[in-house]
Amino acid sequence: MESYKVMLNGPAPWGFRLQGGKDFSMPLSISRLTPGGKAAQAGVGVGDWVLYIDGESTGTMTHIEAQNRIRACGDRLCLTLSRAQNHLGKPQKDSLPCSEPPKYNFAPSTALNKTARPFGASSPPNPRPGLVTKPVTYVPLAPACTPQHNGQVSVPDPSPGAAMKTEPGLAPRTPAATPGPTSRPPWAVDPSFAERYAPDKTSTVLSKHSQPATPTPMQNRSSIVQAAQQAPESPGRTPLCYKCNKIIRGRYLVALGHYYHPEEFTCCQCRKVLDEGGFFEEKGSIFCPKCYDTRYAPSCAKCKKKITGEVMHALKMTWHVQCFTCAACKTPIRNRAFYMEEGQPYCERDYEKMFGTKCRGCDFKIDAGDRFLEALGFSWHDTCFVCAICQTNLEGKTFYSKKDKPLCKSHAFSHV
């Protein structure tokens, strides 16, 4: 790993923003640079990993610990970094199978800033194609408003039934298992990841996964969905129907390791024959997809109706996608970042328009913890309130104004 060291002379700001940390399960890295700032002039690049801060390793630091360590440096900051392009060529480990959500350790900074959890205490893995999310935690802008994670979106869709096999003398064949897809971390394959997922945002990354062709054995999960397989009678062996315990003459179904007459393999509620279209098994009972959704599907926190399509997990509750909307523009939030203000969710655009505060000098947001001042009817970072001509810092000093621009005593009557 090629690393380099930079020495920045104070005072702050240093001209960069961080993302990641131990509490995000992501390496600490540079997410944004201020054009012409101290870090940019020193050759620091967006996406570069921060290995050491003043000689102290960042491997065990949380995001807040890293920020506090930088603040404690005073007028001189020494950083050891690794170039971003070095990480792109490294082989990444395969992602987790789609039936298990990725494991992350989240340490929320406020009582409300917590990740949404999947519905139910022991929700069964979804064996069909679905979407897996990777939430990113956010540090709140101000005590009055707390951004939230919007969880995950999943799309249940029962798989079609297996093909009919009626030629005599052929044993039923099981499709070969398809290996699960592999993926690489988004910060390694997407050059724009650092900009889109800066620390002042909350969002989720969605990855499409395919279900292996062979269903997972029943003992490994409490609820499964699969298709009953039809097969002819094997020579020299007479199967018995698992339901009626009678000898099967002719075609039969193989499901859950048992044999059935085709007309006796039915949904336990609506009695629909399940030789095609797939089925669910829950605690020994067999359901068609429709009855399973009706009985076990979660309820929407807004309209209180059952959710049988896309499920939105947010604020520790489940929602229809069309029910969880921005309080201002009424647009479904889906997997985008959102912020909470007075108990109502807002999309990022409307929140910035209605509640956001920007520095008059640099036009960047004033984040929580940033030093700022109010002057000339605007908000300024403490380091951005300077003379419009000579750039002398005017914090705590006498100043003059012309066309809403601050001027020092020496340039009070200069043309702006």
From Swiss-Prot:
Record region (Disordered): 145-191, 202-221
One term under GO cellular component: actin filament
Biological processes per GO annotation: actin cytoskeleton organization; cell differentiation; heart development; muscle structure development; negative regulation of DNA-binding transcription factor activity; nucleocytoplasmic transport; ossification; regulation of protein localization
PROSITE patterns, sorted: LIM_DOMAIN_1, LIM_DOMAIN_2, PDZ
Location of the LIM zinc-binding domain: 239-297, 298-357, 358-416
Domain of life: Eukaryota
UniProt xrefs under SMART domains: LIM, PDZ
Residue ranges of domain PDZ in the record: 1-85
NADP keyword on record: no
Keyword Ligase in record: no
Domain observations: The LIM zinc-binding 2 (LIM 2) interacts with TBX4.
Subunit text: Interacts with various PKC isoforms through the LIM zinc-binding domains. Interacts with TPM2. Interacts with TBX4 and TBX5.
Name of the featured protein: PDZ and LIM domain protein 7
Source lineage: Eukaryota, Metazoa, Chordata, Craniata, Vertebrata
